[in-house]
């Protein structure tokens, strides 16, 4: 099952990498609601491989910079709400 970037609680003490986690989560949250369906499906498929997570975030950041005024297309960018490529072979238990 793929793991999307998620927000993790930070503390009062600045830790190395905390800002990167927040940046990744905020980027994914913003972009996954606005990108075209084909691109979202491609990124969700890439997130099944943990080695491609940085590439997905980098592509999402580039897309976000190029499409600053993009309208919201969907409420959520998760696999459950956006079944697509490879979804049929996955069993999701909540």
Curated annotation (Swiss-Prot):
> What is the first-listed, main subcellular location in coarse terms?
virion
The keyword Cell cycle is assigned to this record: yes
Write the record's keywords in alphabetical order, separated by commas.
Answer: Cell cycle, Host nucleus, Virion
Task: Quote the subcellular location field of this record.
Answer: Virion; Host nucleus
Q: Which GO terms describe its cellular component?
A: host cell nucleus; virion component
Functional description taken from the UniProt entry: Seems to function as a Vpr-like protein, since it mediates host cell cycle arrest in G2 phase. Cell cycle arrest creates a favorable environment for maximizing viral expression and production.
Protein name per the record: Probable Vpr-like protein
Which organism does this record belong to? Maedi visna virus (strain 1514 / clone LV1-1KS2) (MVV)
